[in-house]
Amino acid sequence: MYQAGLVLEGGGMKGLYTAGVLDYFIEKDMDFSSCYGVSAGAIHMCNLISKQKGRGLRTATKYLNDKNYCSVYSLLTTGDFFGVDFCYRKIPMELDPYDYETFSKYTGKAYAVMTNIITGKAEYYQIKDLKKDIIGI
């Protein structure tokens, strides 16, 4: 494991470039002692930690035209442009199963970075149990 922090930016579909770089890290079996992900970067970080090469590109392209994934329909019906239930429950638990077991074996630290809507400041949420922590966010 590299004793280094990896910071992964957000940016929606622009994050697919990041996903490609992380796929290379998976190929080379590169692990980092700490990872920080913002928005799409947090999603791709989880794919890196679970060693699911190709998952970032696959899920983004496969569901891109699904109105439940990201759309005005989702925004109007759920209040979120990205359908939270579809993206964080249906895809990883049914349609493209996430490898929670491999993630749970990660010995480094993983953080999802988010903005506190009251203070406007960044907050770092450590992800220990991916299934519980992500659904809870």
Language-model segment annotations:
Residues 1-38, 46-137:
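Patatin-like phospholipase
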